Each structure stands twice: as structure tokens, then as C-alpha cells.
From Swiss-Prot:
Active site, per annotation: R287, E316, H347
Protein name per its UniProtKB record: D-3-phosphoglycerate dehydrogenase 2
Residue numbers binding NAD(+): H208, I209, D228, A285, S286, R287, D311, H347, I348, G349, G350
Modification N-acetylserine occurs at: S2
Signal peptide: none
Provenance organism: Saccharomyces cerevisiae (strain ATCC 204508 / S288c)
Catalytic activity reported: (2R)-3-phosphoglycerate + NAD(+) = 3-phosphooxypyruvate + NADH + H(+); (R)-2-hydroxyglutarate + NAD(+) = 2-oxoglutarate + NADH + H(+)
Length: 469
């Protein structure tokens, strides 16, 4: 069999078996007899074509807050220029740095506000190497054609395990006993120390973390209730309750796993603590705004709440250092640290080697796919658009990435510009005021790319344009 004949056979087989790569595609595995008919040098899967952007030189990536080395490797393997910093940057320095970068990677301490993003003249995308994205002005970023990606589940196991440890530690007052013995005090007591078996855990927010926590808790003999604003299938024997009050009334331990939104701000405050069981425990490893800490302090002082574990706070230090967690940062700090059976940790829920490595891979891969292919699946502020990767057989094919205001008539205008060429694939979607069109056009000569770019750049609804070829 000739090489070209094998290629034709491969293409025919891919079409017959529907190897489209699309999410809804159905395929079956080729039989071994078919595989044996192919020469060893022929691959069933075509090699994706490495695309390069028109009118852009080296891709510059700025990584802050000690983003994991797995991300650095992925970016450098792509040939990107990477600038790495272990901590966040002061606002004025960040404004200067962001002027010339195409992508920026941050964690939870860097704030990408409208003031900062106004200076991001080349920025294509933002990677939040964490779950939360409230540190980024998502709406403004979208209005400038900047896609934002995060890691919604890579640290789920690490956070869930931390909460399990805190449940046991609170029930046995391990924090207080450890502090006492560190200072030379031997205090062997059993009063108000409990097994967790048979107790009820109430989970507020049954997402990636809440559901994993549910499974781990049941394995230790806890009964699990959960409250969520949407109906979610329970894992194991966990049971969803219809109101937050019902969960609070019935739970021995209450743990929060919700995002920071206007609806979740001070989700647990004085009325909610009053609704809880006497001697219940509170755990917050989600966002610092969801628990009203002054009200929690009063509930602990009144012996209504027997203890709490907090990993997040309304205001957190910008960097590690002695004395940085103080009353200047949060006015109630001294009062909180003086209370018994209070476990305080410095936002370490996802701080494990495994989680950070996984987050680095997940977010860096998403950013690379968006930069290299225009794939926006997983973006938190942007339409989710994807097309199959181009391959090396498509020599004169250009991928058009056109971000525009979501107004009538845009597709007609764009397709009129592209009509001199064959539009092989096209996908468009919208997200609020922003829409995103991705199209592959063939039979494009190198000399025509600039003309296409300039015509698209003159359209009135344009937010940003990239051409990959």
C-alpha cells in the first residue's frame, strides 16, 4: 500500500467512525483486524497543527504569586517568554508589567481591577491558578476581549481533607491541647470532647468540594445534610434539605463551600448562629466574606458555638510574614485569636503539592489552548467556543477569532468579508454583551491575511481580533 493510499484509507475510516473530536460525537473503537492493515508509520489521529498569530511576536507570560512549576514548564514548552515572581506586585509595578504581556497568571492576592486592566493593551487572557475569580473584574475584562480561566476542581480533594481534619480537631479540642503543651501545660481532659461518628455534618454548597467532603465524612460515620440553591443528586446517603435554616437546626458541624457573591456575603451572621444547635461548630474554607466574624466571636463567647475553624478572612496579608495578621488588617483579630477552640489557618485549603501541581497543569493548558487555538471552553466570563484543531493537511487555512459586541448584523458583516474564501467551519456564541465567533477559512494566501485582518479591524462591533495560521 502506498503512503498516500494509506492516508486515504485513514481519512475514510475517520469519517466512517465519526472521529470528529466534538463533545457530542459518538465513536467506536476500530477493530484489531483493521489496525493490523495499517503501516506502522500511519497514525489514526492526525497531528494537530501548531498555529502562530498574525501580527504578534513572542508571546509574553507574566506569572505571579509563586504559580506552580508545572505551569512554567507548559508555557516554556510552547516557546512562550515567561516572567515569574514569587509574590504579588504593587499596583504601580503591575500596571507597568501588564502593558506588554499577552497572558497573566495570578492566585488569590493579586487584584486585576479596571484601573489595572485599562493598561493591558496586549492582554489576551488571564489565568486564576485557584478556584475563585472575584479578584478579577470579570465584566470589564470581557468588554476588552480578555478571557478569564480558573481551576474549578483541581484542589477539591485537598480542601475536603483539610475540613475533615478540622472536624476532628474541633471535636477533640486538639488546637488548644497542642498550644497548652507547647507552653508546658499538661491538661488531659475529656469534657466537651467528642467522637465524630454519628454526628451530623451540614454542608452549604454541594459542588466539587462539598460533594467530595460528603463522601469522606460518610466514610467516618457522619450523617450528611447539604443545602444548595440548585437541586443536586446526593452521593451516598447524604440528603439535600430545602432551606438553610433546616440545615442549621440539625447539624453538629456546619461547613461552607460557596463563592463570594452579593448573595453569600455574611451568609452566616447572628440570626444563623442563633438557629444552630447549642455547641455546634463552624468551618469556613471558602471565601472570607461569607461569615460575619464579629457575630461569630459573640456566639463563641456566649457558648452558643463550641468552636470554629477559619481558613479565609475578609482581608488577608499580601505576603507571608510575622505580625502581618493583625488588627490593622481586620479590627477583630486580637479578640478572635484569644478565644478557645478556634483553629486559624492562612488560606491553605488548596496548598498541597498535589493540588498546586494539578492547578498549574489545568490552568496553563487552558490558557495555551486559548492562545494557540482560540478554544475558550472553561472560561468564566466569556462565551465557550471551540473548533477541532487544524492539522498539517490544511496548509492554507486560517483560523479567525473575532470577539465583538453582541448586536444584530455582525455575522453578516463578517461573513461578507470572509466570503472570498471557503468557510470550512464556524461557531459563534454569546455571553451577555460579548459574543465570540471562530471560523476556519481555507484557500488563503499569505498575502491575503493582512487584508482580512484590516477589514475585520474596521468593523464597528469589533472588540478584538486574532488570526491564527
Amino acid at each position: 500500500m502506498s503512503y498516500s493510499a494509506a492516508d486515504n484509507l485513514q481519512d475514510s475510516f475517520q469519517r466512517a467512525m465519526n472521529f470528529s473530536g466534538s463533545p457530542g460525537a459518538v465513536s467506536t473503537s476500530p477493530t484489531q483486524s483493521f489496525m493490523n492493515t495499517l503501516p506502522r508509520r500511519v497514525s489514526i489521529t492526525k497531528q494537530p497543527k501548531a498555529l502562530k498569530p498574525f501580527s504578534t511576536g513572542d508571546m509574553n507570560i507574566l506569572l505571579l504569586e509563586n504559580v506552580n512549576a508545572t505551569a512554567i514548564k507548559i508555557f516554556k514548552d510552547q516557546g512562550y517568554q515567561v516572567e515569574f515572581h514569587k509574590s504579588s506586585l504593587p499596583e504601580d509595578e503591575l500596571i507597568e508589567k501588564i502593558k506588554d504581556v499577552h497572558a497573566i497568571g495570578i492566585r488569590s492576592k493579586t487584584r486585576l481591577t479596571e484601573k489595572i486592566l485599562q493598561h493591558a493593551r496586549n492582554l489576551v487572557c488571564i489565568g486564576c491558578f485557584c478556584i475563585g475569580t472575584n479578584q478579577v473584574d470579570l465584566k470589564y475584562a470581557a468588554s476588552k476581549g480578555i478571557a478569564v480561566f480558573n481551576s474549578p476542581f483541581s484542589n477539591s480533594r485537598s480542601v475536603a481533607e483539610l475540613v475533615i481534619g478540622e472536624i476532628i480537631s474541633l471535636a477533640r479540642q486538639l488546637g488548644d491541647r497542642s498550644i497548652e503543651l507547647h507552653t508546658g501545660t499538661w491538661n488531659k481532659v475529656a469534657a466537651r470532647c467528642w467522637e465524630v461518628r454519628g454526628k451530623t455534618l451540614g454542608i452549604i454548597g454541594y459542588g466539587h468540594i462539598g460533594s467530595q467532603l460528603s463522601v469522606l465524612a460518610e466514610a467516618m460515620g457522619l450523617h450528611v445534610l447539604y443545602y444548595d440553591i440548585v437541586t443536586i443528586m446526593a452521593l451516598g446517603t447524604a440528603r439535600q434539605v430545602s432551606t438553610l435554616d433546616e440545615l442549621l437546626n440539625k447539624s453538629d458541624f456546619v461547613t461552607l463551600h460557596v463563592p463570594a457573591t452579593p448573595e453569600t456575603e455574611k451568609m452566616l451572621s447572628a440570626p444563623q448562629f442563633a438557629a444552630m444547635k447549642d455547641g455546634a461548630y463552624v468551618i469556613n474554607a471558602s471565601r472570607g466574606t461569607v461569615v460575619d466574624i464579629p457575630s461569630l466571636i459573640q456566639a463563641v463567647k456566649a457558648n452558643k458555638i463550641a468552636g470554629a475553624a477559619l481558613d479565609v478572612y475578609p482581608h488577608e496579608p499580601a505576603k507571608n510574614g510575622e505580625g502581618s495578621f493583625n488588627d490593622e488588617l481586620n479590627s477583630w483579630t486580637s479578640e478572635l485569636v484569644s478565644l478557645p477552640n478556634i483553629i486559624l489557618t492562612p488560606h491553605i485549603g488548596g496548598s498541597t503539592e498535589e493540588a498546586q501541581s494539578s492547578i498549574g497543569i489545568e490552568v496553563a493548558t487552558a490558557l495555551s489552548k486559548y492562545i494557540n487555538e482560540g478554544n475558550s471552553v472553561g472560561s468564566v466570563n466569556f462565551p465557550e467556543v471551540s473548533l477541532k484543531s487544524l492539522d498539517y493537511d490544511q496548509e492554507n487555512t486560517v483560523r479567525v477569532l473575532y470577539i465583538h459586541r453582541n448586536v444584530p448584523g455582525v455575522l453578516k458583516t463578517v461573513n461578507d468579508i470572509l466570503s472570498d474564501h471557503n468557510i470550512e467551519k464556524q461557531f459563534s456564541d454569546s455571553h451577555g454583551e460579548i459574543a465570540y465567533l471562530m471560523a476556519d477559512i481555507s484557500s488563503v494566501n499569505q498575502s491575503e491575511i493582512k487584508d482580512i485582518y484590516e477589514k475585520l479591524n474596521q468593523t464597528s462591533a469589533k472588540v478584538s481580533i486574532r488570526l491564527l495560521y
